[in-house]
């Protein structure tokens, strides 16, 4: 007899967490860096839309996204001019651009303009004049925010991001989504394959318009948060006071080896979080994310030990 594992408990665990994350994001009381950053970008999109929509407004949007999401376009020469020219060529009105992005998401093989824009074209140059390469992460973030302006769109657009890519495999393992799903933070796959992988995961988690956020918005919020835990980087998950409380609780404020070494501090934070401390913060959603991350990590470790 073939024995099949029942992953329904794990799936339900994530679904309950998604509901809490969704409520937290839309709550007027939410004051973490993630929500604040997202709202700032959306305000820029709204004030630069409609009659104000032009190539200059697109460039402004790209600069703000790049700055807040640290996609590092500013290290290139002339990337935003190239990117804004490409996006503006999709249509002279936002409605045209939104429609093309939606068509690409639904039938990616049929909208070559966006496929080539995200996957093939290069933007900006290096100091020596050589091409600086593509901008997949920034462009998917732009598409993500662009579709959020359409209140009738319940699906949204997935962000191609190292945190999401890094957590895709362990989450698939946790919910029993098997098959060839090799994806990591360093993977560079085409946008169509990435779209299909995220669609499949969203279906497995039964994300189908049942949350107050778009489908890909809530999926990205979940993967991003788990990725932040895995990096030991909580600055955008907490407000300043909560973050300082966490540092003090783990006595990292006494760490003097190298105060400017952010990576080292992140590693120490992660190590302390792995010990499973509870009730360090009076923040229910953070506590729930923390516990789930420990469950997720335990699943990963168990599978690795069995191999």
Where are these regions (language model features)?
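Enrichment for repetitive, rod-forming helical segments
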Residues: 45-47, 68, 83, 148, ...
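Phosphate/adenylate-binding glycine loop and adjacent helical scaffold
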Residues: 62
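Surface-exposed cleft-lining segments at the edges of enzyme active sites
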Residues: 101-105, 151, 181, 185-186
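Generic structural signal for hydrophobic core residues of well-folded globular domains
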Residues: 66-72, 87, 118, 142-147, ...
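Helix-hairpin-helix/helix-loop-helix acidic hairpins
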Residues: 54, 67-134
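C-terminal accessory module of base-excision DNA glycosylases/AP lyases that mediates lesion recognition
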Residues: 1-43, 48-51, 57, 156-307
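Short, solvent-exposed secondary-structure capping/transition elements
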Residues: 74-78, 149-158, 176-177
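Catalytic DNA-binding helix-loop module of base-excision-repair DNA glycosylases/AP lyases
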Residues: 119-170
């Amino acid at each position: 007899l073939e024995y099949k594992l029942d992953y329904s408990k794990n799936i339900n665990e994530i679904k309950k967490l998604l509901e809490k994350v969704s409520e937290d994001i839309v709550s007027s009381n939410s004051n973490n860096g993630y929500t604040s950053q997202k709202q700032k970008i959306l305000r820029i999109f709204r004030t630069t839309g409609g009659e104000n929509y032009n190539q200059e407004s697109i460039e402004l949007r790209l600069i703000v996204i790049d700055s807040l999401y640290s996609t590092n376009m500013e290290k290139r020469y002339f990337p935003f001019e190239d990117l804004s020219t490409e996006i503006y060529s999709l249509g002279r009105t936002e409605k045209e651009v939104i429609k093309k992005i939606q068509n690409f998401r639904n039938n990616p093989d049929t909208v070559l303009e966006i496929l080539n824009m995200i996957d093939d074209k290069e933007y900006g140059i290096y100091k020596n004049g050589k091409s600086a390469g593509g901008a997949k992460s920034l462009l998917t973030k732009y598409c993500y925010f662009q579709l959020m302006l359409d209140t009738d769109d319940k699906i949204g657009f997935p962000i191609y991001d190292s945190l999401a890519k890094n957590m895709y495999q362990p989450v698939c393992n946790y919910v029993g989504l098997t098959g060839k799903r090799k994806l990591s933070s360093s993977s560079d796959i085409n946008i169509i394959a990435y779209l299909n992988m995220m669609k499949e995961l969203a279906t497995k988690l039964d994300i189908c318009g049942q949350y107050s956020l778009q489908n890909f918005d809530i999926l990205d919020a979940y993967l991003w948060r788990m990725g932040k835990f895995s990096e030991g980087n909580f600055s955008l998950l907490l407000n300043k006071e909560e973050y300082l409380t966490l540092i003090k609780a783990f006595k990292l404020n006494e760490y003097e080896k190298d105060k400017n070494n952010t990576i080292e501090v992140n590693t120490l934070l992660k190590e302390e979080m792995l010990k499973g401390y509870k009730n360090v913060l009076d923040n229910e959603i953070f506590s729930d994310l923390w516990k789930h991350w420990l469950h997720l990590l335990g699943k990963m470790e168990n599978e690795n030990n069995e191999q």
